[in-house]
Amino acid sequence: MPDLWSESILEGRKLSIYHLKSTLEKCPFLFGQSKKSKDFQFGSHLFLVEEQNVFIFGMECIVYEKNKEFIVFVSKADSTGFGSKGVSCNSLAFCCLVTLIDGLRKQGAENVTLTLFAIAQGQYLFPESVDNGQKHVLNDSGLLRWWVNCLEKLRKYYTDSEAPNDSEKQKNSTLLPKAYLFVPGLENIRSYLPNRHWIESNAITTGKAVEELPRFPDDPKCRYLCELQDEKSDMSVEEFWDTLTYRQECSSGKLVGFFTLQLQFYQTREFIAKDNFGDSGVMIPAKLYRVTYDTLLKHPFGSLSDAQSSTEKFLSNTLSAVQNLKDFHYKRYKLDICGLAKRDDRKNHNHSKPATQANILQPRKKVKK
């Protein structure tokens, strides 16, 4: 797995990857009062990427699990604007997600559903970073294309580019991934989608909304579903998606997107035993994780000096809090990476090898009507 990161970063660049994950907690209402909620647990993962003593990228994911079924909700992804030109935030996001998903595969995952809600904002994880002048803030259209690019690399990464030659390769390959995008109020979504493997819809389209749709933090679906639950509504999933267009963030005048990527895996002993960065991350108590996460949100990143100071203080305090925990391994807490990608490799990159691609999507201005 370190190779994945190295091949995504321009030669000569050096990064440090930090990965914290919380212990599992019960999650009795992921699907409201539906029986589907039974036995689900959840844990959080925080990835932070440091370059030259300052954080340049971060991502938080919440993983819900039951048996061999996993739902990965990308809660937040953000940059500070202080990364060098040889480091693509899109590729960093891709590497974080592969690291997380491969870790779930080592746990025996057979079904992994990756989902996220994309809404354009100036900052998500790094306070005041929108003010530093170096941060490239995408508009709503640009953000949708940015996530399409990232998830398309994931889709290709988990799809065999050539037909398996033997039964063992067949067992170790994924079933065909399915990618979905729904943009409330936008009829022509096809212009955002790269190929026929993407579906202009939601992954869940049938049944009763309050029983079939999961509820995630800071997700407009959750607030609406809770209202329907209180009203004891029998609204269908199809009607839910139609009416969501006129509610809350979805009716603000900006484009927002609901993304889903469905992955299915065959398991083999070879993959489960494989020693890779899927083992990354320091497991910490859920309460300590929340305290650590909240601390990050209190540090300023409005200037380079502030960002460097905030990075140093956060890492120092975090290490002091976790290094005495049972089973702490520093190499799982921090991974140092040296970039290996050549400029020509990145420029002429073939999508069949998504690990080496690093593209930053530029925002496109909406046509004024």
UniProtKB/Swiss-Prot annotation:
It catalyses: L-lysyl-[histone] + acetyl-CoA = N(6)-acetyl-L-lysyl-[histone] + CoA + H(+); L-lysyl-[protein] + acetyl-CoA = N(6)-acetyl-L-lysyl-[protein] + CoA + H(+). GO terms for molecular function: histone H3K56 acetyltransferase activity. Residues 1-346 form the Rtt109-type HAT domain. Histone chaperone-dependent acetylase that modifies 'Lys-56' of histone H3 (H3K56ac), which occurs predominantly in newly synthesized H3 molecule during G1, S-phase and G2/M of cell cycle. Histone H3 'Lys-56' acetylation is required for S-phase-linked DNA damage tolerance and proper silencing in pericentromeric heterochromatin. GO terms for cellular component: chromatin; nucleus. Belongs to the RTT109 family. Pfam families: HAT_KAT11. It is an enzyme of class 2 (transferase). Signal peptide: none annotated. This is Histone acetyltransferase rtt109. Acetyl-CoA binds at residues 117, 136-138, 146. The modification N6-acetyllysine is found at residue 221. It comes from the Eukaryota. It comes from Schizosaccharomyces pombe (strain 972 / ATCC 24843) (Fission yeast). It is found in: Nucleus. PANTHER family: ALTERED INHERITANCE OF MITOCHONDRIA PROTEIN 6, HISTONE ACETYLTRANSFERASE RTT109. GO terms for biological process: DNA damage response; regulation of DNA-templated transcription. Its main location: nucleus. The active site is at 219 (proton donor/acceptor). Keywords: Acetylation, DNA damage, Nucleus, Transcription, Transcription regulation, Transferase. The gene is rtt109. Residues 345-369 are annotated as: Disordered. Its EC number is 2.3.1.48.
